């Protein structure tokens, strides 16, 4: 059911006004911070700190992926752009926000100009004017159930309508870089189990 819903959301990206389609990502704080940086007087460090404070006020935890940042620094091969990107805070789970909520969050941070945004305002920013796909499929926020949105669409799992017996698929693969005459057999041989059936799928809209 999740893969079906994702396919519908991807379809929306090309067939529905982009302002009506939300983003579902751990990197939502980064997207907001980059919009804040478009305003004069806001560098990356200041924007990152302000976004973290906004989410903290709303009761949503954020963190910098310190292991990824350390790995990039230790590699000695990371570009400055990659290092900068790794310093943005992320949520601990995929967060679903509409374009309006993202823009409004950035505007609120700029208007506050370093002042703390109150809890009620922060929660209102992240919980009004939802996107079309959010209204359809709902939203769950682990940190605060008040942000949850009931879905208007229920998508069932695809179910096989008859008994199916597992079959074994035998496969071989050739090594593209093997020298001629170096190896006479296959680069890989194996079997995988597979099943096939006629599927029954349905969705209901409230």
Stretches with model-predicted labels:
Residues 2-19:
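N-terminal ordered "arm"
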Residues 17-206:
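RAMP-family (Cas7-like) RNA-binding scaffold and associated basic/acidic loop-rich RNA-contact surfaces
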